């Protein structure tokens, strides 16, 4: 057995680990390095065609953003992840590809003027659209047999819709070992995400440690402050703009606003950035079925594309 670290080692993005066991090569996550020049992402430190399986803990781009590069460069294996992560990846990776294409187009306009060679995008929308062909979805808590001597279990990590920690049970040379990859672990008592679950034992644990030295405030401790700011601003005839991550944070923010009663009678307008699948925005429904310890108060009533919707439709 051999474990190699190709990302999120001495840094916080680009999660990518490779486990070699029983003649098979298994990736756990394949994320983009973010906040650096793209040269860090252009070359993969392994031959994609040599990878048999890729297990994705969740859809955030720093954990899944180089999956289209795998496929573009010869990956022929299978991608295993949860159903909701698969759904989110199909949207987010196409948006990422749209950004890659736009960035390359912008740079190439400058390259042409300067007489420099043109650059290719890391991957294209067409590359990202192929990803679902390679995905097999897994259910939380249900063992999945990958190959001889390798079994996996995904459990809810409470970080994002579909996020998971993964335990691999590995048998080789008459010995059986378990190794857990935590993925990003969420906080407890979040408004629209279930609390994280935890494995009770493992021989080895590969732990994400971003924010690991920080004590988070309780989610509802700041909603009263937010409600006060919103009400005071609206009372003066103003508008409140709240920059937010598009995935989860925005939904959680709207949930907190609704639960606090802020801006009663006023309807929030959510502005989406440009998307590779522009025509599909507003028609995508992603939901986790089953009982929730919290979040049951949420109701999705109407989603509409386009400019500010009439109040009667919200």
Task: Annotate each PLM feature.
Residues 6, 82, 155, 182, ...:
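Generic beta-strand/beta-sheet core signal
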Residues 9-11, 21-77, 81-135, 185-194, ...:
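Pre-active-site segment of Zn-dependent metallo-hydrolases
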């Amino acid at each position: 057995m051999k474990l190699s670290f190709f990302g999120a080692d001495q840094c916080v993005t680009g999660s990518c680990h490779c486990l070699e066991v029983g003649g098979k090569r298994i990736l756990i996550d394949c994320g983009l390095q973010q906040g650096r020049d793209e040269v860090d992402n252009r070359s993969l430190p392994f031959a994609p065609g040599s990878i048999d399986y890729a297990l994705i803990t969740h859809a955030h781009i720093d954990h899944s953003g180089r999956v289209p590069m795998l496929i573009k460069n010869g990956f022929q294996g299978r991608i295993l992840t949860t159903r909701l992560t698969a759904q989110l990846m199909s949207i987010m990776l196409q948006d990422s590809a749209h950004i890659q294409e736009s960035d390359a187009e912008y740079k190439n306009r400058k390259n042409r003027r300067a007489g420099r060679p043109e650059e290719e995008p890391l991957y294209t929308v067409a590359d990202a659209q192929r990803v679902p062909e390679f995905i097999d979805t897994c259910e939380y808590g249900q063992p999945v047999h990958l190959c001889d001597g390798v079994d996996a279990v995904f459990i809810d990590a409470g970080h994002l819709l579909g996020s998971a920690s993964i335990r691999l049970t590995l048998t080789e040379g008459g010995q059986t070992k378990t190794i857990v990859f935590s993925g990003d672990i969420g906080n407890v008592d979040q408004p629209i995400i279930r609390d994280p679950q935890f494995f009770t034992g493992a021989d080895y644990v590969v732990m994400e440690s971003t924010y690991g030295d920080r004590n988070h405030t309780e989610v509802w401790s700041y909603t009263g402050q937010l409600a006060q700011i919103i009400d005071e601003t609206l009372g003066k005839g103003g508008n409140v703009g709240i920059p937010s991550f598009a995935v989860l944070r925005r939904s959680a923010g709207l949930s907190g606003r609704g639960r606090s009663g802020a801006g009663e009678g006023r309807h929030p307008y959510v502005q989406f950035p440009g998307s590779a699948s522009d025509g599909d925005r507003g028609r995508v429904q992603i939901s986790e079925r089953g009982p929730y310890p919290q979040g049951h108060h949420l109701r999705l009533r109407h989603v509409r594309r386009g400019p500010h919707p009439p109040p009667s439709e919200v």
